[in-house]
A protein has these predicted regions:
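Gly/Ser/Thr-rich phosphate-binding loops and adjoining beta-strand/alpha-helix segments
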Residues: 35-65, 90-101
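Flexible, Gly/Pro-enriched loop and linker segments at secondary-structure and domain junctions
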Residues: 26, 32, 36-40, 69, ...
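Acyl/amide activation-and-transfer machinery of modular secondary-metabolite enzymes
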Residues: 32-42, 52-55, 102, 106-126, ...
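Extended low-complexity intrinsically disordered regions
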Residues: 2-43, 49-56
Length: 293
């Protein structure tokens, strides 16, 4: 995406949408809070094409295996790039288009009670493929679990937590004011997934079913995706016979202000099409077009 010259009203991370219809102008004023404008989309995905695909990718015994998470995340961010309204948000009653596409998620350092969590944020480029995204996730996870990576967002929270309570509350109120105007410096929010295009959580990895996660008034994220636990489901095959196939339920929470229902419906169809044809994720976006169906 080409860099645009920053104008008055733009944020560091986004461009103010000036030529908008009356509805989108008014909605940010009368419905100013993101958490008050949540809409929910439930989708069930057949994992059989993805299972075959990741088995092929893992055939050579690579140390960091491809998983369903990598495929779903890649398909989702490619959908966001191809459907740019999904990369919009409201802040301070204004309507913005992000300058970049990013994906945020939380890394559990180990599966144990009391284990620490760290935040990860990936920048996705039009030329990104599942291979490049897989490698970036590998680096994020390895650095986090080996505690080599300095996460400025986590460090900022630790500093605030160490202050006297009255000081930390005052500091957080000031930071929230900065957030409202898009003035938070990177040392505070550099790796905060609440500022991502897509915030994704794999609850299936801890054996929980899919649900919905709320949006937050902090940050700018307008799209949250929950991946549930895999399960066997009776489905019709191409001959009309019922057979058990592995599926996963996805729960999408979206800001209903940024796009209409028709736009979301076409976006979900594209997302599922990419999951049904995962080899497309090996192509850069300049070689992917939307399905005509």
């Amino acid at each position: 995406m080409a860099e645009q010259k920053r104008r008055w009203g733009d944020r560091r991370d986004a461009t103010l949408l000036r030529d908008v219809d009356s509805l989108h102008f008014i909605m940010g004023i009368i419905y100013p809070n993101r958490a008050d404008n949540e809409a929910y989309i439930a989708e069930r995905v057949n994992l059989e094409p993805i299972k075959d695909y990741i088995a092929t990718k893992n055939y050579e015994g690579i140390p960091f295996k491809y998983t369903f998470f990598h495929v779903i995340l890649t398909a989702l961010v490619k959908t966001v790039i191809l459907r740019p309204k999904l990369n919009r948000f409201y802040a301070n009653e204004n309507y913005y288009q992000r300058n970049k596409v990013t994906a945020g998620f939380v890394i559990k350092k180990e599966f144990a009670d009391g284990s620490e969590e760290a935040m990860a944020l990936l920048e996705i480029k039009p030329e990104s493929t599942i291979e490049t995204i897989h490698e970036e996730i590998h680096q994020e996870v390895a650095a986090c679990r080996e505690q080599k990576k300095v996460n400025t967002t986590d460090n900022s929270m630790n500093v605030l937590n160490s202050l006297p309570r009255f000081l930390s509350k005052a500091a957080v109120r000031f930071i929230r004011w900065l957030d409202k105007h898009g003035w938070c410096p990177d040392f505070l929010i550099g790796k905060d997934p609440n500022y991502s295009s897509v915030f994704i959580s794999n609850l299936g990895s801890i054996h929980l079913k899919s649900g919905y996660h709320h949006l937050t008034n902090w940050g700018t994220s307008s799209l949250f995706c929950i991946i549930g636990e895999k399960k066997w489901t009776p489905l019709y095959d191409e001959h009309g016979l019922v057979e058990m196939q592995e599926t996963v339920d996805l729960g999408l929470t979206v800001d209903e202000r940024i796009a209409d229902g028709y736009y979301y419906a076409k976006s979900v169809r594209l997302f599922k099409y990419l999951l049904e044809h995962p080899t497309l994720l090996e192509l850069s976006l300049i070689h992917i077009s939307e399905p005509t169906r």
